[in-house]
Amino acid sequence: GHAHFMLKQLFKKIVIVNDENMEPDAYNELSNTTYTNDEQWQKIADDFQFAYDNLPEVQIEKGRPAQAAAAAYLAKTYLYKAYRQDGADNTLTGINEEDLKQVVKYTDPLIMAKGGYGLETDYSMNFLPQYENGAESVWAIQYSINDGTYNGNLNWGMGLTTPQILGCCDFHKPSQNLVNAFKTDSQGKPLFSTYDNENYEVATDNVDPRLFHTVGMPGFPYKYNEGYIIQKNDDWSRSKGLYGYYVSLKENVDPDCDCLKKGSYWASSLNHIVIRYADVLLMRAEALIQLNDGRITDAISLINEVRSRAAGSTM
């Protein structure tokens, strides 16, 4: 289900094969139009439904997906499926209420409570190895180090995103537009229509605190380590600042962390969270808003729960 979901996000029309005993000669007969767009989403949902029906409410071994993880991914699938599209330009043709009701069903707080899920007290805790598999991590891809193998089951996927001075190769750089999008008014509300009129100024502009957990900014410690102050120079950023001087932060770790294997490329044992509890709250809120059946206040409450945690995330 996870693999098919990612493929569908990227390519829309995908090949779905459920026959694990298919003969190689039959591969050339496969088509990405065997099923309609809606049918493909339903096939993916069916996989997560099977997981939901068969997984335990709580896993004894840390990191394994429980029933709530399947429910969350099932809800996410139905949320994507609800927005019906047509044509090569992906024109929205309608929003399916039955799919939205499934989103509400599988984001039920009781399901999440049985799994012990909730928001972390600080947003940053989702991206620090010492808090892995915490309350907010509904499902994550697990990584490890020093597990008896040469390189461990490390996350090499982020090996090119560390700043130039700390390995290689300063890819996945945050844009100025992204930084500007974190600007807020004096009440902490987003500047939807004017955020990009002028570039963010740290000394004068109000900003969502999540910026400092997402983007490494010149003058600030890298991953909260004051031994590594980000500089606006070629040592930290590639191509002489052609792509700016912000650096990727969220998916990387403290350079002094024992979870890190250094070399030409750096890799760490930091898990990659696929679905957080905050995602579950916001998916439920979106479905309630689109259904417009008298529960808008409930949706606003869910959104404010996430926003309130963000406002206090100054760790």
Feature-to-residue mapping (PLM):
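An aromatic- and glycine-enriched ligand-binding surface/loop that stacks and positions planar moieties
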Residues: Q49-F50, R64-A69, K76-R238
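Surface-exposed, extracytoplasmic segments of Gram-negative outer-membrane nutrient-acquisition systems
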Residues: G216, F220-Y265, L302
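Aromatic-anchored glycine-rich loop motif in surface-exposed flexible loops
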Residues: H2-Q67, Y78-E98, Y246-I275, R284-M315
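Short amphipathic alpha-helical coiled-coil/interface segments
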Residues: G1, L74, V103, T107, ...
